[in-house]
Amino acid sequence: MADIIARLREDGIQKRVIQEGRGELPDFQDGTKATFHYRTLHSDNEGTVLDDSRVRGKPMELIIGKKFKLPVWETIVCTMREGEIAQFLCDIKHVVLYPLVAKSLGNIAVGKDPLEGQRHCCGVAQMHEHSSLGHADLDALQQNPQPLVFHMEMLKVESPGTYQQDPWAMTDEEKAKAVPLIHQEGNRLYREGHVKEAAAKYYDAIACLKNLQMKEQPGSPEWIQLDQQITPLLLNYCQCKLVAEEYYEVLDHCSSILNKYDDNVKAYFKRGKAHAAVWNAQEAQADFAKVLELDPALAPVVSRELRALEARIRQKDEEDKARFRGIFSH
C-alpha cells in the first residue's frame, strides 16, 4: 500500500485511507466494474460538498478501460479494495474537467448514456452549455479551477464477464450478443411474477437494438431486421405495462407497431385491451374485430374480452344512473 500511495503522490494525488478494505487488491483489468459511493468536496477548509452519490440514491458504476472522461477516477479506484473507504486530494491538472463531467454523473448513476440529452441540442443551446453548466457551484469551479477531494467507498469489484453491463456502456458487438440473454431474463422474471423488473429487462434489450438501429439507413434490410427484433420485445414490454395498468403507454407503443406492421395480431389485441381499460369501447371493439379477421382461432379469447367489456359498460351505466338519480333527488 505504501508504494501505491507514493506513486499517487508523485502524480499529484494524496490518498488517505479511512477504513481498510477486504482481501487482496483486485487486478482491475479492462472491463472490470467498480461500484462505489463518492462524495466530491472543495479542498478548502470548509470542505463544501459539490456532489454526493448517496443523495442521488444509487452508487456509481465505473467500467475500467472505457475511457471515462475523468481519468483520475480510474487511477484512484484501481488502488482500492472492496469495503475500503478513502479520501483522495487531487491536483488541478486531474480535475479541470470535473465541472463538465459532473453533468453526466447523474445519468451514469442511473444507468443511462452519459451523453443523453446532449447529442441533439441545437446550436444556441450548445453555445449556452459552453457558457453555463446550469449550476452556480460548477460554473464557479469551471471559471476558477481548484484541487478537489474525492471521498470514495468501494462497495463491489466485479471481473469482466461476471456482470451485465448497462446498454450505453456496451460495444455494438456486446449489444448484439446481450439482447437474447436479456430477453430470456425478462421472460423468466415475468413468469415468476416480477413484472416491473421484467419490463426493465425488455427496456434494456430494446435500448440495445435501438442504438444499433440508429446506425443503419432507415428502411434498409439491416434496419428492418433490427426492427423485427424490437417488435416482440416491445410487445412483451406492453404486456408488463398492461399488468401495471399503464394503459396509455400501451396504446402509444402498440399504435407505433401497427403503423409499420398492420397485420400484427398481438399489437391489436393488447391495444384492444388497453382501449377497453380506459373506456374507449368503440376503439376496443374495432381492434378485437381486427384480431378475429387476422386470426379466427382467437375467437374464444376475443369473445371473453368483449363480454368483459360489455359487463363493465353495463355496470358503469348503472353506477352513472344511480349517481344522477342521487343528484336530482336533492
Swiss-Prot record:
TPR repeats lie at residues 179-212, 231-264, 265-298. Residues 54-146 form the PPIase FKBP-type domain. One of its GO terms (molecular function) is peptidyl-prolyl cis-trans isomerase activity. Pfam families: PPIase_AIP (PF23322). It is found in: Cytoplasm. It comes from the Eukaryota. The modification Phosphoserine is found at S43. The keyword Cell membrane does not apply. Its main location: cytoplasm. Keywords: Cytoplasm, Phosphoprotein, Repeat, TPR repeat. PROSITE patterns: FKBP_PPIASE, TPR, TPR_REGION. The keyword Nuclease does not apply. One of its GO terms (cellular component) is cytoplasm. InterPro entries: AIP/AIPL1/TTC9, PPIase_AIP, PPIase_dom_sf, PPIase_FKBP_dom, TPR-like_helical_dom_sf, TPR_rpt. Gene3D superfamilies: 3.10.50.40, Tetratricopeptide repeat domain (1.25.40.10). May play a positive role in AHR-mediated (aromatic hydrocarbon receptor) signaling, possibly by influencing its receptivity for ligand and/or its nuclear targeting. Interacts with RET in the pituitary gland; this interaction prevents the formation of the AIP-survivin complex. This is AH receptor-interacting protein. It comes from Chlorocebus aethiops (Green monkey).
